[in-house]
Amino acid sequence: MLIFSVECMNLFPPILQKYIQKNQYSNWLIEPIPNRLYNCIIVIPALAELENVKKLLLSLSENESTYFNDTLILFVVNNTISVSEDIKLNNKLTIEYLNNLTSKYTPITNSISIVTSELQVAFIDASTVGKEMNDKDGGVGLARKIGMDIALNYFDYSSRIKKIFICLDADCTVEKNYITAITEYFQKESCKAAVVNYEHNIYNMNENTAAIICYELFLRYYLLGLQYAGSPYAFHTIGSTIVCDYESYVKIGGMNKLKAAEDFYFLEKLSKITKVHSIKSTCVYPSSRPSFRVPFGTGQRVNRFIAKVRNEYILYNPQSFVILKKWLLLFDSLNKTNLKPILTEVKRISTDLYHFLNENKFEQFWKKICLQDLKDQQIIKQKKFWFDAFKTLKLIHYLRDHGYPVINMFDAIDKLLELFGVNESVKRNEDILQDLDKQKEYLLLLRKLQNN
């Protein structure tokens, strides 16, 4: 592992100069200061994650080392001012561990393979007194933003090789070709943004196993529905799977400061300026634990499942995606067409769709499009911006609440697979809610369909 001690000078491209000036941080810096520049920087927020940081670094150290010298692994150890003393202590120990790991003077027992690897590790202290994030903005979004914004100073802009950000979480592990597969995909493909394949661990039989199988089925079912409908937003939105180049990052104004769903909105903005690819040649393994860290997402869904607050074995009605598909086919075909026949066709598809579009001011949007002197590509762009990932989800929720209620999870999956024309199926019996092996079969089938 290389040791950083000398501050690097860097020449910023014009696209970056204004962004850097606007997003400066006097309170935070990379420690130790890197003595070189990189083509890839992996940014990892860490909140009370000492043991998981060690596991993740061990996992990364077992990667193919081809691109280690060009890759910086950057932890953002963070908390807000008002967190518990236990969290502050864990973060303090995490910073001490990372500081020792990057110091040539302090040997680290039980981390020899990490120390002797060529992994290049650094951290940002957003935890100790005077460096904490404020309670109003502090959270995973701001932690990612701090790391990514500061990391912009340490890309090698003199190199023609693409400069990429990889987003990861401290409670993940990764496949052994993770760094290589992502780096080479971006260098070989015309790619500016991507999501990496993910899989939760479903083989350790504990109280979380049923919860995480159920949650991943929910995630993959929604994605399958979007794929069936032909949505341009058919990609999973998990923070630990996001990759993008620095130019796209800057063009969309960087990472947001949201305490949750920062990944959803970040990817939505990326998808409005470039295609979001799917990297299927490697895999991230997120944690399946309960968590207090964000108000919703994996950890909270596991919490809710274990608490038995509600029936978790339900999914959106497959007919919602049929309506979405018909709407997208109509919407994509529109080109300054008179509004009346459009609305007539919308009503033919679904009166609930008509009411949704009316409530979301589709008529005003379309009249504005028709009044402007726009070329075909500009119209396509405006349509994509208007009916975005969030409005897509709003439509599915609207249909759920207006005539297309949620149904049994496995009935929904069977029906959507049938609509998709998938010949494979899972033979199940009535007690599937008690049969984790059959539930795993469903999940493995969805993984197979989405990873091929």
Kindly give the residue locations of the regions a language model identified.
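Short, acidic, metal-binding catalytic loop of nucleotide-sugar glycosyltransferases
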Residues: 58-70, 82, 97, 101
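N-proximal low-complexity "stem/linker" segments adjacent to membrane-targeting elements
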Residues: 2-66
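Acidic donor-binding loop at a coil-to-helix junction in glycosyltransferase catalytic cores
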Residues: 258-265
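Terminal low-complexity segments of carbohydrate-biosynthetic enzymes
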Residues: 2-11, 304-452
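A recurrent flexible, glycine/aromatic-enriched loop bordering the glycosyltransferase active site
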Residues: 223-243
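Conserved donor NDP-sugar-binding/catalytic core segment of glycosyltransferases
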Residues: 177-212
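Acidic donor-binding/catalytic loop of UDP-sugar-dependent glycosyltransferases
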Residues: 161-162, 169-184
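Active-site-proximal specificity loops/subdomain of glycosyltransferases
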Residues: 87-161
